[in-house]
Amino acid sequence: MLPKVHRLWHPQDFKTVYARGVHRKTSHLTLRALRCSPQFDRIPDGNRGERATRIGISISQKVSKRAVVRNRIKRQIRAAFRQLLPKLSNGWDIVIVVKPTALECNYAEFLQELEQLLVQAEVIHEYSGGNNI
């Protein structure tokens, strides 16, 4: 589970990211990211400053009719994000849209694709090539 401060869950927030955010694609995932205006909310280390980056995952029944399968994919993506959290810049709202081809992916592939998408969207600035597992 992602820390509460890093969760994007209001439907209006998802709509805003879809409407105004940039998008990047790989074969299994689509990333939509929106840089938020600077606000003085708490960030995870307790200091005042930019709002923490918030992450939402969207996976439709087109990916799988079985909720068990969809939830497993979401857990793998959340685990990959937990590993990438220290590298993320503050002040972003991110939505990951899962494509039906993601059924073939394992954790390492999700981690590599997420890192690649985040670098393309300039949410993180270094790319390790997936060697950080």
Feature annotation, model-predicted:
Residues 1-133:
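Positively charged, solvent-exposed patches that mediate nucleic-acid binding
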